[in-house]
Structures are given as structure tokens and as C-alpha cells.
Amino acid sequence: MEQYTANSNSSTEQIVVQAGQIQQQQQGGVTAVQLQTEAQVASASGQQVQTLQVVQGQPLMVQVSGGQLITSTGQPIMVQAVPGGQGQTIMQVPVSGTQGLQQIQLVPPGQIQIQGGQAVQVQGQQGQTQQIIIQQPQTAVTAGQTQTQQQIAVQGQQVAQTAEGQTIVYQPVNADGTILQQVTVPVSGMITIPAASLAGAQIVQTGANTNTTSSGQGTVTVTLPVAGNVVNSGGMVMMVPGAGSVPAIQRIPLPGAEMLEEEPLYVNAKQYHRILKRRQARAKLEAEGKIPKERRKYLHESRHRHAMARKRGEGGRFFSPKEKDSPHMQDPNQADEEAMTQIIRVS
């Protein structure tokens, strides 16, 4: 066992190397560094920087006091822990394959800023541990220049928003690792909702181009149009959970301007064009505010009662006095009764 002691102005550090493991202890704070193979360690307590060199292909685990865990596989790593105001901690880690440093800034109460995909465990206000898992695609490197990196800002421990406009809504997990509810909204406008969370609830999505599909894993995917205003659309899709795990989808057409008023029946082309002109004139007067938009059911109550009492034929047409007196327009029941009377008389 070999022991090395280095004296500095601020504190005394002791590095113990035994069986390929290195442990470093400092006064006032504990920093444990564990290696599986031999490595060279350079420590500077004034700046609190630990530089570790590891053989290619060997795993490295650096555990910093405060519950943070950083892992790397076979790459030189430099961890710089700088304490800030109000208990803030800033750590810099080199990104594999690039020349820049990856900076992680932790703000304990509720705001977290992360660049890159990491798994961070934070302590909630009620004492429950919350786990945030953020994944990003592999960063492309061209001519030594890294493409735009994903920046994620979590505020209030409820919503995570990236630089590309992607919004991630997360909720705390239980002790056994089960997620209560997970909703992912990518940039393409696709929403994935677990089918189990739809029990006893109704989800209404507006939009004429709304597409809803269900997969075999018990999830429901709703695709919404990205561009355009989906509020002023011509349709509404309602998902109502049924007896099974897959909710039923119902499309309800919204009434337009032409569906509010009933089309008159049995009119010729001249009458129809005249009706269209009257509707345009009425719409113009309603827009100017000269006439009310609400129309009364009838103009005179006496005429309405008289029209409702009149007999109507096929298609709702009224019988004229001439048609009513004609023999071929008589009631078929009355004609049958007269025929039976004639048969009885003949017999």
C-alpha cells in the first residue's frame, strides 16, 4: 500500500492507493474517487479540480459529495466543482468526440438547467425523490465543430422545454419506479397518452386534420397539425373511453353557416337565387347592426297556429282547395271505407 501526502495552504489532502483503487478525502467535504485500474491523479485544492486519466476501454466512476453521479467509459474526464451562492454547484465535463466542455449547473430549490442528456435525481419539497430522464439524439461533429446542442430548462419541477421548442411534461415516480402519468409532446405535434390514464376521463381535441391511432402497447397517439389555427377548425374529435383499453373515437361535425337555416323544399332555380340574394342582404344588415341576429319563430301567432292546423301532403306541402276537393287527392283510408260500403250493398 502506498500513501502520498500533499500539503497546501487551505487544507491537507491524503491519497491512498491500494489494489488498484484510489480514495481521496478532504477536510470539510468528502470526495470519493474509485478506479478499477491504476491511474494518474493530479489534485489542486485551491481550485477544487480533479483530473483523472483512465486506460482506454476501462470504466470510470466519479462520485461527488451531494448525491451526484457522473460516469464515463474510457475517456479522459475533468470534473470541476465550483460552489456558488445559495448552495449552487457547477460541474464541467468534457463531451466525448468534441473539444468543448459540457457544463451542468444545479440549483437545489426548483430550477435545473442541463445541457445534454443526463439522469438527475432531485429531492422534492415533500421528501419524495423525483427522477428526470432526458434523452437527446447523438450530436453530429463535422470538421471539429459540434452542431447545436439541446438545452433543457426545468422550472417549478413540472415542465421541461428545449431550445427547439420541444416541451416535456413529467410527474414524480413512485418508489418502485412506476410512472404515474407520462405525456410527451415532440416538435412534430404528436401526443402519446397511456390508455390506462384515460379511464373515467374525456379528452377533446379540435382540428379537422386530427389523427388518432392506438398501438398494441396500450398507448394512444394523437397527431395534430403543427401549422395553422386549430381553434377555428371545422371539426371536433372526442375520445371517450369504452369498456376495453382502446377508447372510442367519435367525430362530431360543427354546424356551419349554411346548416343553421333549413333549406326550403321544392323551389325552382329562380326562387333559389332570390333566396340567396335575400340571405346576403340579411347578413350585410346583421353585420352593420341594423337588424338583430336572432330571428323570431314566426311573425304573427295567429298565422302560425293556422299553418300548423292545415293538412300537409307529401314533402310538407299544403293542400290547395282544388286539390283537396279532387277525387285522386282524397284520403286513402276514406276511399277504402267507401269501397267496403259499396261491396256490402252489392252483396
Curated annotation (Swiss-Prot):
It comes from Homo sapiens. GO terms for cellular component: CCAAT-binding factor complex; chromatin; nucleoplasm; nucleus; protein-DNA complex; RNA polymerase II transcription regulator complex. Keywords: Activator, Biological rhythms, DNA-binding, Nucleus, Phosphoprotein, Transcription, Transcription regulation. Residues 311-328 have a biased composition (Basic and acidic residues). The modification Phosphoserine is found at residue 326. Its main location: nucleus. This is Nuclear transcription factor Y subunit alpha. Pfam families: CBFB_NFYA (PF02045). Residues 296-321 bind DNA. Residues 299-310 have a biased composition (Basic residues).
